[in-house]
């Protein structure tokens, strides 16, 4: 297993880092925690067709600000996104005009799942 910190900053990007995004590369999966602006580096680390799972911890801006970059990615596999209740609605607002193209136009297919407490 390899852990890569793509972003570790708090509220905003700086010369030395981006907002939160962590990649865990395991034998069977890629697991991504949060979608801060560090997410734009993700495709540099995805070099196989292992499933990709993205977990959104919460909807503060610095944890989802990188979602607009999904239009850059050309992953062959589905990108599975997990988040709390309301994730679909948030994604439909953030992954849309005027920020980026709508979800339906993304080159990578998304599968969105909402998790409940408990």
Identify the role of each PLM range.
Residues 1-118:
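Binuclear metal-dependent hydrolase catalytic cores
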């Amino acid at each position: 297993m390899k852990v890569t910190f793509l972003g570790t900053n708090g509220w905003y990007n700086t010369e030395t880092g981006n907002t939160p995004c962590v990649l865990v590369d395991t034998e069977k999966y890629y697991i991504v925690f949060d979608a801060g602006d560090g997410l734009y580096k993700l495709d540099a680390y995805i070099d196989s067709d292992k499933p990709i799972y993205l977990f959104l911890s919460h909807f503060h801006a610095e944890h989802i600000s990188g979602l607009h970059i999904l239009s850059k990615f050309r992953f062959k596999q589905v990108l599975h996104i997990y988040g709390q209740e309301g994730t679909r609605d948030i994604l439909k607002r953030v992954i849309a005009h005027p920020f980026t193209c709508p979800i339906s136009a993304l080159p990578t297919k998304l599968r969105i799942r909402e998790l409940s407490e408990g």
